[in-house]
Amino acid sequence: MPKKTSFVFNSLTLGLLCSFSHASSVIEPGFEFHGYAKGGLGISNDPILNAEAYDWAANGMNIFRLAGNRYSDSSGGRMGNEANWLELHFNQGFTHDHDMAWGLNANIVYGDELALDELYTQADGVFTQHSNARFWAGKRYYARVETVLNDMQALSSDGLGFGMDDLDVGAGLFSIGVTRNLYNETNLESGDMVAVSSSLRKIVLPKQIELDVFANFGTFMGPAVSDDNSNARELNPNAYQLAFKLHRGDYFNNDEFFLRYSHNTSMSITRTWQQTPSYQIGAFYQGLKHITEDYRIAYIWSHENAHFDEAARKRNYTEQVDAHWNSLVLRNSLAWNQRTSTEIETGYEQVRFTATDPAQDGTNSGYKLTVSQNLHAGSGYWDRPVIRFFITYANMDVETLVYQHSNDGEQIKMGESEATTIGAQFEAWW
């Protein structure tokens, strides 16, 4: 995946605390500043596992990103295996007049360069009978479903656009928005994929389970549509996504299951650098358990099944027919006291490919183990800031490169390879 766009997968921000529930905060008058940051240094004398991933991180960590993983920036978990990242959020709430509340939000990020990822305004109370409905317009992260341990969005519609969120319709909160590509990966003179994203959230089910349902549709729009010599429609067919999420628990003990079906797209309609298979099915199960007050286990299983018919192979410049990705990550955390803790993160990942030429069929697999001794501001699982001193070992076995595009710059060694990284990193949010 291109370096200048891969940073979007790293953004957790305060979503680490919000990934299991979505609720619009009240727009308060005045200025607010908050953010998220992580950074570190790795040292490894072993051959580079994945040159593209190593360049993406640019911090010395010998990143384990399994060959053929098109879904997350790192494999086997993010601890001791990720790039540096910064988000600075600035929010200005205006004085409440006429029972309305208005706000302006900006988000400046830094991965390998500064960028203004979000700039939008929002308003509550525009409709007096539906005062909780929030209208917005601008540039923002939108309709995201986060996964924590492998730091990715299983669903998103980030972009420039407008919409309405959290209209109470009785059964739940209804949201709808229109967005187009935020990161300018396509030629804006030709056009872009435009997504209409909708959701009905916080549907209460028995046994304290909450249900969210999602339905998104995307189509190519722009000057190229009226150009008889353009193949923009062929390369960007209409797409849709249907998904649901089940959640039970709170920030400290929870389980979540997410299932998504995508047609002519992957995890996001507006991230136009992602592959566009004829269909893709994603399933994710994640959770956190406090076994005791000081010992916790976090876990995630991730699955993507992508199928490429002839048209999809043509527009993606690939010879793969099917790709089955499975990833399992387990993080154990033991707090010794208010100042120190130890974490052990293990992960296994596999991608099985079938190709138009059976000789190119194969399974790529690998695993990662990270042991980290931590210094932190408190003993809670979510307490930050934290400094981690870690050692990471990764092993990767590559049987096929059929997933590569004809213009890929990814440098991957066939066969088995391994690498060890020692280093330190910090993580903070405020």
Language-model-derived ranges and their functions:
Residues 1-30:
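Cleavable N-terminal export/targeting peptides
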Residues 202-358, 363-371, 375, 420, ...:
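Detector for outer-membrane/organellar transmembrane beta-barrel domains
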Residues 360-412:
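C-terminal structured domain segments
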Residues 44-48, 113-115, 144-148, 185-188, ...:
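Outer-membrane beta-barrel proteins
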Residues 22-130, 167, 332-344, 389-430:
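Beta-barrel outer-membrane channel/assembly domains of diderm bacteria
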Residues 24-33, 46, 91-104, 126-134, ...:
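Short loop/turn motifs that connect adjacent beta-strands in outer-membrane beta-barrel proteins
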Residues 34-42, 105-107, 136-140, 175-181, ...:
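Transmembrane beta-strands of outer-membrane beta-barrel proteins
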Residues 48-76, 117-120, 127-232, 405-415:
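Surface-exposed coil loops of outer-membrane beta-barrel proteins
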